[in-house]
Curated annotation (Swiss-Prot):
PANTHER family, per database record: FAMILY WITH SEQUENCE SIMILARITY 216 MEMBER A, PROTEIN FAM216B
Protein name stated in the entry: Protein FAM216B
Signal peptide: none
InterPro entries: FAM216 (IPR029373)
Higher taxonomy: Eukaryota, Metazoa, Chordata, Craniata, Vertebrata
Entries under Pfam families matching the protein: FAM216B
Similarity section: Belongs to the FAM216 family.
Amino acid sequence: MWKDLPQNVPRIPRIQVPAAAADNSLLKDLNQGQRCYLYSIMRIYDSRPQWKALQTRYIHSLGYQQHLGYITQQEALSCAAVLRHSTMRASATVAPQRTILPRVFSHAKKGQPAKPGFRVGSRASLHSMLSTKTLDKA
């Protein structure tokens, strides 16, 4: 009978409950349908896609700032490494710790701008962009 249905009818994807959620003692008394419903709600509120978009936007921003000469290639690579390290650590632990920025970005640094003759008004905007709030998972 189900074979007689037209092929253009969309199918509802099966929602699989992850083992981590299924083994939770609070979910033990729920039946399979209730767990699937709860997990579908969990997927709606999942912040991972937003987190990935933020990371992508941050990497593009680093490249653009390097292109404009606000930061050097070494600084951009250092920031990308901090982001990668922070992401790996955040995914490995339940409560991520604060990330310490590389020495390159200390306020005491009095170096030359990336392009000769090009002065940046303030490095405070760069520091605010690199604050640990944007690097650690909220």
